[in-house]
């Protein structure tokens, strides 16, 4: 039996894209299969999605757009991604609910309410959080840390392009070694860029475990991690 009862999965927006599609339907279905595998273990799951496949606020500022406006555009991009994931969930008979850090009218999605979110998770629904913290100048990593704390998640599972945290960039350095586990203090001391400083500080303060792993190459990876297999890198106190 897994030690996890409720998890938060952090996905980048880029993970949804392919060479031909901003939002790739094959990838969406893979993500839903992964969600199903988590639910089949009687583990509750919430997701925080980025928007970098559409617009990234930090990138837009380089074009001359005001930083605050750029971040708002980036947050709207995450809402688009969340709706796409939720729609694919519903098509596959997975009950999903989108909750946004920005107030969006017209019945498009719900505003974030941590009490309602926890109640929905207990009923087996998947919560897809979007729009980060709802404020500019914060990353979706910080949004993930905040939402995980709000819903009382046991851990954040951060899906990345590589299968964990390494001593160096494994793409540039083939001799880089992967860490199986790290303490928060070790990660800070070694200056390992796991999350931005604000997100990492929140996780450390609230003793919120972080697992960094690669998800889409093998759709069983998250399920295997939840069963206790030593994959990726765990960061804890």
UniProtKB/Swiss-Prot annotation:
Activity regulation (record text): Inhibited by UTP.
Pfam families from the UniProt entry: AA_kinase
UniProt GO molecular function: ATP binding; UMP kinase activity
Chain positions recorded as UMP binding sites: 51, 71, 133-140
InterPro entries (UniProt xref): AceGlu_kinase-like_sf, Asp/Glu/Uridylate_kinase, Uridylate_kinase, Uridylate_kinase_bac
Reactions catalysed: UMP + ATP = UDP + ADP
Domain of life per record: Bacteria
Keywords from the UniProt entry: ATP-binding, Cytoplasm, Kinase, Nucleotide-binding, Pyrimidine biosynthesis, Transferase
One GO term (biological process): UDP biosynthetic process
Presence of the UniProt keyword Nucleotide-binding in the record: yes
Pathway participation: Pyrimidine metabolism; CTP biosynthesis via de novo pathway; UDP from UMP (UMPK route): step 1/1
Annotated residues for binding of ATP: 10-13, 52, 56, 160, 166, 169
EC number: 2.7.4.22
Subcellular location: Cytoplasm
Similarity annotation: Belongs to the UMP kinase family.
Assembly mode: Homohexamer.
HAMAP family on file: PyrH_B
Function (record text): Catalyzes the reversible phosphorylation of UMP to UDP.
Protein name: Uridylate kinase
Annotated organism of origin: Vesicomyosocius okutanii subsp. Calyptogena okutanii (strain HA)
Organism lineage: Bacteria, Pseudomonadati, Pseudomonadota, Gammaproteobacteria, Candidatus Pseudothioglobaceae
Gene expressing this chain: pyrH
